[in-house]
Amino acid sequence: MRVLGIETSCDETGVAIYDQQQGLLANQLYSQVKLHADYGGVVPELASRDHVHKTVPLIQAALAEAGLQASDIHGVAYTAGPGLVGALMVGATVGRALAYAWGVPAVAVHHMEGHLLAPMLEANPPAFPFVALLVSGGHTQLIAVTGIGEYQLLGESIDDAAGEAFDKTAKLLGLDYPGGPMLARLAQQGVPGRYKFPRPMTDHPGLAFSFSGLKTFAANTVRAGADDHQTRADVARAFEEAVVDTLMIKCRRALDQTRFQRLVMAGGVSANQSLRASMGEMMRQRGGEVFYARPEFCTDNGAMIAYAGMVRLQGGSQASLAVSVRPRWPLEELPALGA
């Protein structure tokens, strides 16, 4: 089976083609970072308009990259949620229309299932069961995964997601959008131990997260005096260490609770090198394994949607002719494969 995947949930337009036998045949991505930079964040209407202009050309580019014709595609997958409703509608409408015109099935893909399955694109994919840490700008969740669509929510953020806290703290430090990766780079120059940030909710039982207080702590620290580059770097390092430690503590609890030996990290924040190193060391000490996608597949992309769509189509899933998207869509509502 050969599937075309379309991702337009937020500020990246992604199109990819995945073949069941040959793997990833094409991967095209257009980022709207420059479009939204002057606003310090994503402007939904601008995002939707840009997807309208970029989606079809990227589909043409993906087909050309793979050396394929429309008749070589066996299915179309598109992100149907969660995300920005206008942006989602662009990809869903194009995807559904193409599937109808080409006479192939279409499937609506859950954006976070795409992220969760992105490590499956690597040479050493994780086997079930595993604990998944979904950590991005919009989500921070721990999921017990025993199969495709067999997802149990163990805990999630009660306020800001970790990625959102990264971006907002970066803005406090005067960094440009998107701030998370820039904060991580600045943190590498920071002196460890100069500032001590709290590890929120780690002294509470359970697996819930909270990052709004950490963001406030960072804001107060900056206001107290962070005018020079080194001080800002020290604040960035203290903040990053607090987030990484918090995520690691909660992951350890989730692994203890489930007794699983595999941890999967997915979503944009999973590209953070400090987080990867800390989780890798933790799993080494536990005698387990940690899995994550290459950095370009941690952020939004069409490859994860094409792969997730292929898995769902093989399991019998298929979208109706009606175009429908879900800006809010709990991952645990997805059916198990073949159900």
UniProtKB/Swiss-Prot annotation:
Keyword Metal-binding: yes
GO cellular component, one term: cytoplasm
Family matches, as InterPro entries: ATPase_NBD, Gcp-like_dom, KAE1/TsaD, Peptidase_M22_CS, TsaD
MF GO annotations: iron ion binding; N(6)-L-threonylcarbamoyladenine synthase activity
Requisite cofactors: Fe(2+)
Residues that, per the record, bind substrate: L134, V135, S136, G137, G138, D167, G180, N272
GO biological process: tRNA threonylcarbamoyladenosine modification
Any matching Pfam family: TsaD
Family: Belongs to the KAE1 / TsaD family.
Protein purpose: Required for the formation of a threonylcarbamoyl group on adenosine at position 37 (t(6)A37) in tRNAs that read codons beginning with adenine. Is involved in the transfer of the threonylcarbamoyl moiety of threonylcarbamoyl-AMP (TC-AMP) to the N6 group of A37, together with TsaE and TsaB. TsaD likely plays a direct catalytic role in this reaction.
HAMAP family: TsaD
Listed name of the protein: tRNA N6-adenosine threonylcarbamoyltransferase
